[in-house]
Amino acid sequence: MKKTALVIMAAGIGSRFGKGIKQLEPVGPNGEIIMDYSIHDALEAGFNKVVFIIRKDLEKDFKEVIGNRISKITEVEYAFQELDDLPAGFAKPEGRTKPWGTGQAVLACKGLVKEPFAVINADDYYGKDPFVNCTTTSYRSMMWMKLCRSPWQDSCLETP
């Protein structure tokens, strides 16, 4: 079976969430977190590797809540999103404390992911269909995007 990785962005701060780590907060009847559902759906669809993008300060809690358990059923790797891990020619602005976002998060796993992959947010639920579509389509790549004329306009063009 060809290797397909699920890359999970879980380094966010969750500043509006309050106490605790939003990505690790139980939501299911048996203490499941949202990632449990996404990982289950992805593995059922044929994914066979999980890469967690996290902050170094979350590593211990992250492994205790989900990482160690998932590593018993599939290959698991960790990438660490660091504020200073930027492409050549770029520098962190003075005073910046928040993660850069999606692009820099995915860049953090550049040495770990050599196979086709899908990127998801740790705290969003996707359902099984997107993962099935990724593993069964004949396309060489898939992308979902939303193009907005400007960040403050509600009128966006959606491309499936």
Question: What residues fall within each predicted segment?
Answer:
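Short, well-ordered coil/turn elements that cap or connect secondary structure elements
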Residues: 1, 71-73, 145
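Residue-level recognition of the N-termini of beta-strands and the immediately preceding loop/turn
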Residues: 4, 48-50, 74-76, 148-150
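Glycine-rich, histidine-containing beta strand-loop boundary motifs that form or position
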Residues: 10, 54, 80, 121-122
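Glycine-rich, phosphate-binding/catalytic loops in enzymes
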Residues: 23-27, 70, 134-138
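Conserved beta-loop-beta/alpha segment of the NTase-like Rossmann-fold superfamily
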Residues: 75, 81-160
